[in-house]
Swiss-Prot record:
The lineage of its organism: Bacteria, Pseudomonadati, Pseudomonadota, Betaproteobacteria, Burkholderiales. Catalyzes the condensation of pantoate with beta-alanine in an ATP-dependent reaction via a pantoyl-adenylate intermediate. CDD domains: PanC. This is Pantothenate synthetase. It comes from Burkholderia cenocepacia (strain ATCC BAA-245 / DSM 16553 / LMG 16656 / NCTC 13227 / J2315 / CF5610) (Burkholderia cepacia (strain J2315)). Keywords: ATP-binding, Cytoplasm, Ligase, Nucleotide-binding, Pantothenate biosynthesis.
Length: 279
């Protein structure tokens, strides 16, 4: 596996490749990330991964400086997955001058849920993903469903900007107790780690209620919010939305069996966790 930091060297290395499968990450890789590499291999060859902690998608009170950086360990994991190239640029490589141009998602998708609680987050994501796509020029890129809203925004962005890349969605990987794998799980204290699976269990109960015929979605959302708060969580949102556009479904759409997803974000101690389940 070649480890490359220069954009020009990356382009030279990939010149002539027309089936490249790309997996962008911020590093601190776990089994969830590695499952993306394996899925990428099913859709293209060679597989290219990137590791770049993107300052543009962190807010002023977020954890950019303490975000775990474990490059050597990540390299060893990617070598075991037979990744062809790891693109690991420095901040100077990616942003040699102030990034004055940004890719802004529409407010109807980028300003809700995560976008409401993390202003500027999706503009940072869209900008860096567009730049990475320009560097790698993949045929396929793999994104996890755990970041459901991000997946939808990136997919729509590629469609509307006519980027010639297929976005493949990967299922969320979970620990045995149901907690979705995340680099931020390492911030949890032992007691918080024991409590953390309750987020997924709460979403499962919401899903079961909807599938069981409950149609008062607002009541389900409020009950879930209250349940988590009573256990010491600080929920940002619990929302049942249409999978197609993350808009709340109408009564007619519910009766017609519109595909739904329940999404949540909540703080447990100092750690903010997100999760979702398709319904």
């Amino acid at each position: 596996m070649k480890v490359i930091s220069s954009i020009q060297e990356l382009r030279d290395q990939l010149r002539g490749q027309n089936r490249t499968a790309f997996v962008p990450t911020m590093g601190n890789l776990h089994e969830g990330h590695l499952s993306l590499m394996r899925l990428a291999r099913q859709h293209g060859d060679p597989v290219v991964a990137s590791i770049f902690v993107n300052r543009l998608q962190f807010g002023p009170n977020e954890d950019f400086d303490k975000y775990p950086r474990t490059l050597q360990d990540d390299i060893e994991k990617l070598q075991q997955e037979n990744v062809y190239v790891l693109f690991a640029p420095t901040e100077r490589d990616m942003y040699p001058e102030p990034q004055e141009y940004r890719v802004l998602p529409p407010d109807d998708l980028g300003g809700i849920l995560e976008g409401e609680f993390r202003p500027g987050f999706f503009a940072g994501v869209c900008t860096v993903v567009t730049k990475l796509m320009s560097c790698v020029q993949p045929r396929v890129a793999v994104f996890g469903k755990k970041d459901y809203q991000q997946l939808m925004i990136v997919r729509r962005m590629c469609q509307q900007l006519a980027l010639p890349v297929e976005i493949v969605a990967a299922e969320t990987v979970r620990d045995e107790d149901g907690l979705a794998l995340s680099s931020r799980n390492r911030y949890l204290t032992p007691d918080e780690r024991r409590e953390a699976p309750e987020l997924a269990k709460t979403l499962q109960r919401v899903r079961d209620s909807v599938l069981g015929g409950e149609r008062d979605l607002g009541k389900l959302e409020q009950h879930a919010h209250t349940h988590l708060a009573e256990r010491g969580w600080v929920p940002d949102y619990i929302a049942i939305r249409r999978r197609a556009n993350l808009i709340a479904p109408s009564a007619a759409e519910l009766e017609a069996g519109e595909p739904l997803v329940v999404l949540a974000a909540a703080k447990l101690g100092a750690t903010r966790l997100i999760d979702n389940l398709e319904i």
